[in-house]
Swiss-Prot record:
Record's subcellular location: Cytoplasm
GO cellular component: cytoplasm
Main location group: cytoplasm
Ranges annotated as biased composition (Acidic residues): 10-20
Record key words, sorted: ATP-binding, Cytoplasm, Hydrolase, Nucleotide-binding, Protease, Serine protease, Stress response
Protein name: Lon protease
Compositionally biased intervals (Polar residues): 802-816
Keyword Membrane part of the UniProt annotation: no
Domain Lon N-terminal intervals: 26-222
GO molecular function, one term: ATP-dependent peptidase activity
PANTHER family, sorted: ATP DEPENDENT LON PROTEASE FAMILY MEMBER (PTHR10046)
Top-rank lineage group of the source organism: Bacteria
Amino acid sequence: MNEPMSLFDDLPEEHDEPQEAPERRLPMVVLGEMVIMPHMTIPLQVPQGKSYRAMERAWEEDRDVLLIFVREHQLEGYKSNQPQNLPPIGVIAQLQEFAKLNDGTARVILEGQSRAQIIEAIQITPFYRVRCRPYTDPPVSGLEVEALMETVKQQVDEFVEHLGEVPQEAVQFVHRIDRPGHLADIVTWGPAFDFKDRLEVLNTLDPVERLRKVYLVLARQLELLKLRVKIQQDTKEVLDQSQREYFLREQLRIIRRELGEDEEGDDPIDELRRKIHELDAPEYVKNQALHELKRLAQQGMNNPESGVIRTYLDWILSLPWADEELPEISITEAQKVLDADHYGLEKVKERILEYLAVRKLAGDKMRSPILCFVGPPGVGKTSLGRSIARALGRKFVRTSLGGVRDEAEIRGHRRTYIGAMPGRIIQAMKNAKSKSPVYILDEVDKIGLDFRGDPTSALLEVLDPEQNNAFSDHYLEIPFDLSKVIFIATANQLDPIPLPLRDRMEIIEIGGYTEDEKLEIARGFLIPKQREFHGLTEDQIEFTEGAILKLIREYTREAGVRGLEREIASLCRKVARQVAEQTEANGELPPKFVIDEAAVVKYLGPERYTYGIAEEQDEVGVATGVAWTSAGGDILSIEVLPFKGKGQLQLTGQLGEVMKESAQTAVSYVRSRAADFGIDPNTFEETNIHIHIPEGAVPKDDPSAGITLTTALISALTGTPVRRDVAMTGEVTLRGKVLPIGGLKEKTLAAHRAGIRTFILPKENAKDISELPEKVRRELNLIPVSSMDEVLRIALSRMPTPANNQNGSHTNNRGQPSPAPAGT
């Protein structure tokens, strides 16, 4: 091979002539074909002989020795005092360590210092000593020198890339060298150089010429290295794949025969091919499966990638591709199932039956709407979906989406990833073993969003009737028909659901249960279920109506019945234990356990919640409001306390920005109408107002507390008590208008549960009264209002006297509130 052309053949030498150094007389050490360059440190083990004695003497003197390097066949001449011609150049090295060992040898560490021109040998025994003149590289500069150094460093990087396993610190050290001679000496110690190359570099005194020789050697070795890699790749490709597989199959056949397995058994490839042909699926699915099977056959079953392909084929074979014959929809039977599984929820059941009726008449022509049940926890959203599946005679599957943050959870991961799998939609379809199940997407309002994508965007395709007939999972990469699936979503709140996703669903709101409904649900569903679950019979345990009501009122506070079921289960466990213990002791069943109110307290401990009216008596500065929560509704006692100060407004109770603005609106409204309420205008300059909404640890943010805040504020500043049996909800404006609110059913249920008898609501919400439970409408005096004046006439025990007509019964002559009545 011709030596590579050098870009630096005509490189000018721009350096000064070195100054001649004084001669030195040093002990000489003869090494074999191991060249130690200047700037290198090498450990050696030296046997007895001339070199041993030379180092021993040097260790006693100034520790410097002269190293020369000769071929192996020349060593004998130096050992027998008959050396051939001394080499022209050696290396002055310093002994860093000289340790004599028990076996007569010495362990030494040599550090190369500089080159030296050898003049003559002046001593032969008992060791060699020579006259020499040290040589130091002259300083050099110039763009060409920099270019040459940069090129050599790039060659070093390329060599490291091919060889690998080179410490990064060594590469960085090479890049920090800024002298050409030093760079040449260090690089020469690499694996690309043999003894001849290193000796040639050592004998070259000119630093630029020395580096040029290093460049030529590296260039030649890199070409050889690339050629060697290419030859290996070509040889590997030439290997006949079919011959390789033949040998592997023969080995497999012999292994099976040795293990005693049936050699006539089906080949895995043939078995998969048979299953694909028998698969009841569209042609494009079979074609994709056969294409992957061909890849599997070409690679062989023992190829690392064969496991990925085999898993992919197993997924295709396990999915329900074929249309199935569905049972006839019976509206009467569906109604029986819904009534048997759920008490109440008449509006919801009516909408479900309408949906089933249209599906019965329209058949496949109907694009199924996506139902979304929205309501507090424990009201039966998921169990409604299970009942629909039972009524239709379809399979039921459920996927919880709470906390899902990765789009791949819905669409799956691409097969390029290790451990890739289909998304939750395809996994659920596989588990259902049906192409048309009832599919519950639970907690769609709890889906998260982060850097991995937006899962709700993937759900858009799933829930769109115009698109889901060709749903594409990233893992399968084959369209899958979801149009026959009845999707039902559930959520606790509507606001967190993105608008595009909400637009694809028909919202059906499920409110909380009334006390009577909970009583009937406990009697008809929860108690029989828990009694059977705990191995009890009707003859062993009985719940009185008073006990059930006590559980509802004083041990649970929820819109649904999940907590009620837990308390019933707890009572059943306690009774089951007593039945088991008494049966073991007496050998016969004990008498029936009757769970009454006293037994509830005995087994469950003291009451956890206070049941009754919101306040025990009419109070000044305290008004009862209602709030909507994810668990239903709850009452709020809003407290206002004025005291002498500088007109500051203080708000406590973890109020949100909206509620803080409602409080400021209430203060501004009352201040603008101070004369109408008999309040001295100076009161607002000389009085601090503190508004507090218990419980302090619970965050609150709702504009519907506006009229409640205003009522409590007017009551506190005029000394007029607020009626204890009145609750209210509504947003107030600066002009005293009452604006509509949401969650009326939950709020009225909370007020009814708390024993409130009069409920003030915005006039624009009067249309929603018909949606309230009959018992609530019958027992709660619902009064729609449109202004604060109407609210005050109902909520206050008496109307405040205007300033121009007051008799001093409500405010003093400074307009400050009178002391609260006794007992408030």
